[in-house]
Amino acid sequence: MDRRWKVMTDQTASSELRVAIAGLGSIGTKIAAALDQGEGLTLSAVAVRDPAKHQAFLNGLRRPPQVLPIDQLGEAADIVVECAPSSQLRAIVEPAVKRGKAAVVVSVGGLLDNFDLVDLARANGGRIIVPTGALIGLDAVNAAVIGTIHSVKMVTRKPIDGLKGAPFIVHNNIDIDTLREPLKLFEGTAREAAKGFPANLNVAVALSLAGVGPDRTSVQIWADPTVTRNVHRIEVEADSARFSMSIENIPSENPKTGLITALSVIALLRKQRATLCVGT
């Protein structure tokens, strides 16, 4: 790396920031491997449902972390990263913020049903951090909401495999396996989308929390057999600017999640120790 640019990610050397991870799926393992490289951060602990399943991976790290119950991660870390199913969000985040620690929430859709955790964090000096994830332009939305945002619209197209098992599809008995052309599955608010597609629409909830809220953010979801990537297009009308964003995310090993999600969390964690921070 050119030394002129390395300053942008240089970490302070005073003390390492301890990070714990709840869940070692496709996102959690990538974050764990990156933390094992150091750079002012250390992987201090993990929580997994089946420790034996992940033992080989953990033993292969330079500094294998402790394996702890999820409610004890906050004792061993400064930041707890939630990389588990959204049903586990409260069990992971609540003990951490009660201890005044920071919690990075990947399953941000689950935060809408547990929003009292924000008040709990405030009362105890903790923090809840939502990473940018798959949503480019989140800085622009954060800035625009300081003024007035008139409307936020998002259209998501996903490959068939990335939508299988979504509650909305199951409850409405929609057959997507035989699709030959795009099908609009859903149109409504970000809050409704999060309930119907909890593993697919974290990006919509993050967009809504950065902007006008989950009840004023409009979302369309398409099952599209013609695409191989998760495609998001966002349009924002504000008094400060009118802008649109489009991104095609390469799926990770979990087809419901884009590869960039893990990279976004890694960037966020490194930013906590960076001497020079770029972005809002």
Swiss-Prot record:
Catalytic activity: L-aspartate + NADP(+) + H2O = oxaloacetate + NH4(+) + NADPH + H(+); L-aspartate + NAD(+) + H2O = oxaloacetate + NH4(+) + NADH + H(+)
Active site as annotated: 232
EC code(s) of this entry: 1.4.1.21
Pfam families linked to this entry: Asp_DH_C (PF01958), NAD_binding_3 (PF03447)
Gene3D superfamilies for this protein: Dihydrodipicolinate Reductase, domain 2, NAD(P)-binding Rossmann-like Domain
Swiss-Prot/TrEMBL keywords: NAD, NADP, Oxidoreductase, Pyridine nucleotide biosynthesis
Cystine pairs: none
Transmembrane segments: none
GO terms (BP aspect): NAD biosynthetic process
Function, as annotated: Specifically catalyzes the NAD or NADP-dependent dehydrogenation of L-aspartate to iminoaspartate.
Coiled coil: none
Other observations noted: The iminoaspartate product is unstable in aqueous solution and can decompose to oxaloacetate and ammonia.
GO function terms (MF aspect): aspartate dehydrogenase activity; NAD binding; NADP binding; oxidoreductase activity, acting on the CH-NH2 group of donors, NAD or NADP as acceptor
Family to which this protein belongs: Belongs to the L-aspartate dehydrogenase family.
Residue sites binding NAD(+) per the record: 134, 202
Upper taxonomic lineage: Bacteria, Pseudomonadati, Pseudomonadota, Alphaproteobacteria, Hyphomicrobiales
InterPro entries: Asp/hSer_DH_NAD-bd, Asp_DH, Asp_DH_prok, L-Asp_DH, NAD(P)-bd_dom_sf
Protein name in the entry: L-aspartate dehydrogenase
Pathway: Cofactor biosynthesis; NAD(+) biosynthesis; iminoaspartate from L-aspartate (dehydrogenase route): step 1/1
SUPFAM superfamilies: Glyceraldehyde-3-phosphate dehydrogenase-like, C-terminal domain, NAD(P)-binding Rossmann-fold domains
